[in-house]
Curated annotation (Swiss-Prot):
The keyword Zinc does not apply. GO terms for cellular component: cytosol. Belongs to the methyltransferase superfamily. RNA methyltransferase RsmG family. The lineage of its organism: Bacteria, Pseudomonadati, Pseudomonadota, Gammaproteobacteria, Lysobacterales. NCBIfam families: rsmG_gidB. It catalyses: guanosine(527) in 16S rRNA + S-adenosyl-L-methionine = N(7)-methylguanosine(527) in 16S rRNA + S-adenosyl-L-homocysteine. Gene3D superfamilies: Vaccinia Virus protein VP39. It comes from Xanthomonas campestris pv. campestris (strain B100). The gene is rsmG. This is Ribosomal RNA small subunit methyltransferase G.
């Protein structure tokens, strides 16, 4: 399945979304290759509940890339990444970022390995394990989690991976006031950024939590 097998408006939707997010149009080609592979594998392996490639552009690619301005370089562990979201789009658009894709589901891990090979994406690797089982203490500058758990839950399973002074960047819908109030000792909110995702209705926030 090549890019031409996608509905004809998918490429335009992605191009418009990248422009709205002030991202280079050259990123469209590798992102479309990733999307094409995801659509193909999803028919057999049920990697995501989103089936429509047009929806995947908005709800997967552009939503993932909304956090891109806040992660520039360093090391990143993407916890519960599923089929590689947001980790693979971030690795594509931030080549200076070293990304570890943490996922315990074997089908999703196999898909991601194939995607990294297909894209020749040398700045990302797959850790097929639950986050709490990854034995790399204080190895990462950043953690991301897009739809994994509450803030406290993310910290409970993956906080050991973050170096002191590092940041957890968690994608949330409405402002998570109660989750912020329930942060464990040694963790504090640095910023909460309202996000605008092209084509996506509803509130989105990026919560940046620092490890003291």
């Amino acid at each position: 399945m090549n890019d031409a097998a996608l509905p004809p408006d998918v490429s335009a939707a992605l191009a418009n979304g990248l422009q709205a997010q002030s991202l280079d149009a050259d990123f469209a080609a590798p992102l479309l290759r990733y999307l094409t592979l995801l659509v193909r594998w999803n028919k057999t392996y049920n990697l995501t509940a989103v089936r429509d490639p047009r929806e995947m552009v908005t709800r997967h690619l552009l939503d993932s890339l909304a956090m891109q301005p806040y992660i520039v370089s360093g090391t990143l562990a993407d916890l519960g990444t599923g089929p590689g979201l947001p980790g693979i789009p971030l690795a594509i658009t931030r080549p200076q970022l070293q990304v570890t894709l943490v996922e315990s589901n074997g089908k999703k891990a196999r898909f991601m390995r194939e995607a990294l090979r297909h894209l020749a994406l040398g700045n990302a690797r797959v850790a097929e394990a639950r986050a709490e089982a990854v034995d790399e203490p204080a190895a990462y500058d950043h953690l991301t989690a897009r739809a994994l758990d509450t803030l406290a839950g993310i910290i409970a399973v993956g906080g050991h991976l973050l170096r002191p002074g590092g940041s957890l960047l968690a994608m949330k819908g409405v402002y998570p006031r109660e989750e912020i109030a329930a942060l464990p000792a040694g963790w504090r909110v640095g910023d909460v950024h309202p996000l605008q995702v092209p084509g996506l209705e509803g509130e989105r926030h990026l919560v940046v939590v620092h490890k003291d």
